[in-house]
């Protein structure tokens, strides 16, 4: 594979090979990352990348779309079946653009949008001041209860009654507990707001029936297709309301996008087909088992898990008990072939560029075939590194780094990723 790249552009070929090596021989614990199947990868690298297809199936602005229409219809129908939805738009290039399309379909610029604070586990597109959502809309942010570190629904209701938002956004990027969508819908109805649920992180769990389906209550559901869904990098919008669906379609095209990425849409179709299988349901169940096992193992080794545990694929780890910052931990673990990301925690006292926590997730480890037994060992490796961080630059004792790195590589060889497959 990649022989033509090797001949044409040796520099990029080297980048691809080095990145393959990093993925193959490293433990990936970033909660938003996963590894696609060879089938998804092949679809993304197909001749479909050559086709312009502005518009929607049977309503294109270009000729020659008869086969890409089939691909997009397959993606839409499979997404609808997977999430029990009446309508699906599979064209958003990303989760951020899925959210933008949903917001533009439901509310005029200057309207009030209420979302979860980024520092409490939300996402940039839920109203962060540096994001389009915080610049185009008036934003009200809710957070977690400082004692329980779970969503404070009383605060959500109080803020909604006070500010009367046009859109309420539920979902997050670093929230490990199951969200009560029924409560959110009741609050939205009370103030006349639309409820948008961003399920980007837990979409795979929803598809497998492990996490409640937000479409039972939300006016609109958005998602990415990577993360727990294990598909290509892209976005998805679902709704059961025909008029909202029409508005979403206009908001995506011609509103914020031109031509859709047909090779990615085909890969989404492959991903949705994989997600409809019994094997995928078993995989999602194992993700949650692994997350619970990893959280418990870290807790048993002296670390604090925000909110006391996890119901999903991810956890937020408070590093204050070890007096290590998220920045130093991310760097130190990276030296040892363990990839994580620094993350703020509720009641954060440090800058987001330094942070007091790390966010961990188990989808990528589970894709390799790892189970609870490996989570115990990985917790050991993580804590060994964290206890040997020398400074804020994340330097680690060389002997410790080599010992951990060697074991990580051994583990990865026991549970290979793409070796022999691509």
UniProtKB/Swiss-Prot annotation:
GO biological process terms, alphabetically, are:
glycine biosynthetic process from serine; tetrahydrofolate interconversion
Q: Where is this site: Plays an important role in substrate specificity?
A: 226
User: Which enzyme class, named as a word?
Assistant: transferase
Family matches, as InterPro entries = PyrdxlP-dep_Trfase (IPR015424), PyrdxlP-dep_Trfase_major (IPR015421), PyrdxlP-dep_Trfase_small (IPR015422), Ser_HO-MeTrfase (IPR001085), Ser_HO-MeTrfase-like (IPR049943), Ser_HO-MeTrfase_PLP_BS (IPR019798), SHMT-like_dom (IPR039429)
Q: What's in the keyword line of the UniProt record? A: Amino-acid biosynthesis, Cytoplasm, One-carbon metabolism, Pyridoxal phosphate, Transferase
Alphabetized PROSITE patterns for the sequence: SHMT (PS00096)
Report the SS bond pairs: none
GO MF terms held by the record: glycine hydroxymethyltransferase activity; pyridoxal phosphate binding
Residues that, per the record, bind (6S)-5,6,7,8-tetrahydrofolate: 118, 122-124, 243, 351-353
Q: Where in the cell is it found?
A: Cytoplasm
Residues that bear N6-(pyridoxal phosphate)lysine: 227
| UniProt pathway | One-carbon metabolism; tetrahydrofolate interconversion; Amino-acid biosynthesis; glycine biosynthesis; glycine from L-serine: step 1/1
Q: Which family does it belong to?
A: Belongs to the SHMT family.
Q: What does this protein do?
A: Catalyzes the reversible interconversion of serine and glycine with tetrahydrofolate (THF) serving as the one-carbon carrier. This reaction serves as the major source of one-carbon groups required for the biosynthesis of purines, thymidylate, methionine, and other important biomolecules. Also exhibits THF-independent aldolase activity toward beta-hydroxyamino acids, producing glycine and aldehydes, via a retro-aldol mechanism.
What is this protein's record name?
A: Serine hydroxymethyltransferase
């Amino acid at each position: 594979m990649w022989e033509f790249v090797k001949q044409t552009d040796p520099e990029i070929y080297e980048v691809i090979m080095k990145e393959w090596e990093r993925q193959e021989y490293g433990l990936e614990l970033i909660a938003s990352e996963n590894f696609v199947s060879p089938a998804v990868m092949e679809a993304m690298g197909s001749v479909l990348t050559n086709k312009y297809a502005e518009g929607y199936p049977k309503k294109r602005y270009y000729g020659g779309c008869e086969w890409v229409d089939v691909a997009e219809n397959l993606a839409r129908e499979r997404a609808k079946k997977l999430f029990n939805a009446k309508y699906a738009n599979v064209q958003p290039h990303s989760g951020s653009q899925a959210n933008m399309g949903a917001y533009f379909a439901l509310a005029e610029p200057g309207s009030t949008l209420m979302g979860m604070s980024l520092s409490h586990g939300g996402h940039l597109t839920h109203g962060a001041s540096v994001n389009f959502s915080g610049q185009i809309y008036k934003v009200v942010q809710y957070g977690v209860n400082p004692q329980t570190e779970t969503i404070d629904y009383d605060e959500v209701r109080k803020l909604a009654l006070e500010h009367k938002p046009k859109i309420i956004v539920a979902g997050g990027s670093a929230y490990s507990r199951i969200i009560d969508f029924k409560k959110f819908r009741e609050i939205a109805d009370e103030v006349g707001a639309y409820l948008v649920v961003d399920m980007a992180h837990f979409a795979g769990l929803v598809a497998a029936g492990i996490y409640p389906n937000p479409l039972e209550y939300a006016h609109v559901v958005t998602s990415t297709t990577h993360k727990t869904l294990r598909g290509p990098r892209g976005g998805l919008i679902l709704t059961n309301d025909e008029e909202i669906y029409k508005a979403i379609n206009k908001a995506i095209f011609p509103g914020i996008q031109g031509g859709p990425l047909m090779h990615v849409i085909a890969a989404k179709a492959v991903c949705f087909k994989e997600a409809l299988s019994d094997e995928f349901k078993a995989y999602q169940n194992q993700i949650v088992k692994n997350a619970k096992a990893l959280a418990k193992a870290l807790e048993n080794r002296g670390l604090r898990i925000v909110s006391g545990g996890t119901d999903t694929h991810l956890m937020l780890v408070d590093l204050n008990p070890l007096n290590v910052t998220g920045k130093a931990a991310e760097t130190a673990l990276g030296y040892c072939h363990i990839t994580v990301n620094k993350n703020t925690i509720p009641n954060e006292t440090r800058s987001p560029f330094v942070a007091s926590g790390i966010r961990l997730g188990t989808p990528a480890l589970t894709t390799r075939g790892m189970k609870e037994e490996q989570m115990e060992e990985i917790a050991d490796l993580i804590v060994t590194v964290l206890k040997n961080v020398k400074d804020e630059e994340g330097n680690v004792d060389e002997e410790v780094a080599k010992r951990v790195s060697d074991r990580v590589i051994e583990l990865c060889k026991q549970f290979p990723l793409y070796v022999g497959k691509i």
